[in-house]
Amino acid sequence: MLKATGPLSIILLASTCPSSGAAPLSFAEFNNFARECAPSVAPSTLAAIAQVESRFDPLAVHDNTTGETLHWQNQAQATQVVMDRLEARHSLDVGLMQINSRNFSVLGLTPDGALQPCTSLSVAANLLGSRYAGGNTADDEQLSLRRAISAYNTGDFTHGFANGYVRKVETAAQQLVPPLTARPKDDREKPGSEETWDVWGAYKRRSPEGGAGGSSGPPPPPDEDNRKSEDDDQLLFDLNQGGPQ
């Protein structure tokens, strides 16, 4: 659930990004929307949040007043139902990144806009960016990112740790795996290790028992051999990014 406590300067890109028309979004669709509409935040970071919030469904709506979670295949129908429930003074979390309806006026959003994947991602990226303070070390940067994620859910830098939201996003980031695609025969025959889609990059840890480690606090520093991707310098912050190399 997106929480906003003050005006945000956002660029609504819905007019340039088509509606998905069906839910949920595929990895490729989500990645394209994220890179086009929220270029300041790594797609993997946004994907982990979207998995927790809507499971990549741009037409998902959670009615906090009734406790219902609603899904549509048709955006026009979804928009009408959202408008009807807002008229009845319901509190709703709307769209791909689950923007709360009480923030619509602050953000300059309409029900239709909140259901647009591009707009939802743009708003989410701007909120995260407004709460991300950075840091002097890689550990500081990662803790700052988690604090921004906490604020995204609760409007507070610490409550999202206490209620388990930050941990849920961490878990989603570790579990998200893109679909396997076929490689050319020549490529399959080449020796060497395979690359994986590791949203935690250099920060992937193991517990003493051998399971996946991880807490809501800052992870250990990265190995010096880890290399940044070409996109790293273009991202405001990234769960993939292990800090300066």
UniProtKB/Swiss-Prot annotation:
Sorted alphabetically, which keywords does the UniProt record give?
Answer: Crown gall tumor, Plasmid, Signal
Q: Where is the signal peptide?
A: 1-28
Q: Which InterPro entries match?
A: Lysozyme-like_dom_sf, Transglycosylase_SLT_dom_1
* Record region (Disordered): 176-245
What GO biological process, any one, is recorded here? protein secretion by the type IV secretion system
Q: Carries keyword Aminoacyl-tRNA synthetase?
A: no
The keyword Signal is annotated on this UniProt entry: yes
- Locations of Basic and acidic residues compositional bias? 183-193
Task: Offer a single GO CC term for the protein.
Answer: type IV secretion system complex
What the protein does comes down to: VirB proteins are suggested to act at the bacterial surface and there play an important role in directing T-DNA transfer to plant cells.
- Which family does the entry's similarity section mention? Belongs to the virb1 family.
The identity of this protein, by name, is: Protein virB1
Q: What is the lineage of its organism?
A: Bacteria, Pseudomonadati, Pseudomonadota, Alphaproteobacteria, Hyphomicrobiales
